[in-house]
Swiss-Prot record:
GO CC annotation terms, alphabetical: cytoplasm; small ribosomal subunit
Location of region: Disordered: 74-98
PROSITE patterns in alphabetical order: RIBOSOMAL_S19
Keyword flag RNA-binding: yes
Protein's organism: Chlorobium chlorochromatii (strain CaD3)
Protein name, entry field: Small ribosomal subunit protein uS19
Amino acid sequence: MPRSLKKGPFIDIKLEKRILEMNSKGEKKVVKTWSRSSMISPDFVGHTVAVHNGKSHVPVYVGDNMVGHKLGEFAPTRNYRGHAGGKSEKGGSAPRKK
């Protein structure tokens, strides 16, 4: 369920403050954050935000088409390595039904 429009978007106060300071100075530094639930505002465009995925910080370059999305959408938390399969040389998988 989406957030109520009367509440407005959630943006971490400290993160927004750092981005606005960098905009006023014209700097482009990587900003580390643990706030995956923060919504990307137009002020973030052109900056790189390192979003924590539970293990490390994943650098995310914010573009125009990312405005309105949440930071956590661009830092996956799960690493999918594929399903376990039999060895292809010996044909270790189960026989197929006809």
